[in-house]
């Protein structure tokens, strides 16, 4: 909803030029879709990891770009659609652990105790995502800032068509998209070169397989533990309270 409203209201910088925007922010959008449908799909596609676009995300309003990034960084909205269900499972394990600490009981999930090993794996998977997208962005920003004219096939100085703040957002979006296995990007970034193809490929591989291995390992550990019957002190994971806790995590 915030994205659709932002796109319908148009670009204030274009409005300052005296240009009428009766149809909303149309830069980078097709007339057959318009700003509302384009804004809506830009969020859906970044949440469910389709990678398809019906508008240029690089031309979206700032709020829209932020929401697109958020959708890929969380990668578990809509109940964890697609591979996001693995991330959602990790969030549940962390939420169960924190909730157990808050009430002073050993955390339990589906009749099995959640202990140190499970939480460590969940924490590593969660931190990996942040490390990959932020580490990759930091590396790219370093080359742009300090080795802009290095003798590569495509010099870092030629990567960015928007060298200011938005250029940084383009690099962040690129690695966020690779980390979320999404496929969309801010196309102001010249990313068809050996650096971006290799770096995002490595990020994609790590972000795809480690979050698969982690939850499977957790399930294996839980399956080997003795089943604990539900009691009065058992944390109910199908309650509104636990839903809010998961959302907070």
Roles of regions detected by a PLM:
Residues 1-249:
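Membrane-proximal intracellular helices of multi-pass ion channels
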């Amino acid at each position: 909803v915030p994205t659709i409203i932002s796109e319908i209201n148009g670009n204030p910088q274009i409005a300052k030029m005296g240009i009428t925007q009766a149809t909303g922010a149309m830069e980078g959008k097709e007339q057959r879709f318009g700003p509302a449908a384009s804004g809506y799909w830009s969020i859906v596609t970044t949440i469910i990891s389709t990678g398809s676009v019906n508008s240029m995300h690089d031309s979206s309003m700032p709020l829209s770009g932020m929401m697109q990034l958020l959708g890929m960084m969380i990668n578990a909205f809509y109940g964890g659609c697609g591979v996001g269900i693995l991330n959602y499972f990790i969030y549940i394990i962390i939420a169960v652990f924190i909730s157990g600490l808050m009430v002073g009981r050993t955390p339990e999930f589906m009749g099995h105790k959640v202990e140190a090993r499970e939480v460590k794996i969940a924490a590593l998977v969660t931190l990996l995502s942040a490390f990959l997208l932020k580490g990759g962005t930091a590396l790219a920003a370093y080359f742009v800032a300090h080795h802009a004219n290095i003798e590569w096939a495509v010099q870092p100085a030629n990567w960015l068509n928007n060298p200011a703040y938005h250029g940084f957002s383009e690099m962040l979006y690129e690695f966020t998209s690779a980390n979320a296995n999404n496929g969309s990007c801010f196309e102001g970034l010249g990313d068809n070169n050996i650096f971006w193809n290799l770096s995002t490929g490595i990020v994609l591989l790590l972000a795809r397989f480690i979050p698969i291995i982690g939850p499977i390992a957790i399930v294996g550990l839980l399956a080997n533990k003795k089943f604990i019957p539900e009691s009065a002190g058992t944390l109910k994971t199908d309650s509104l309270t636990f839903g809010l806790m998961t959302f907070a995590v």
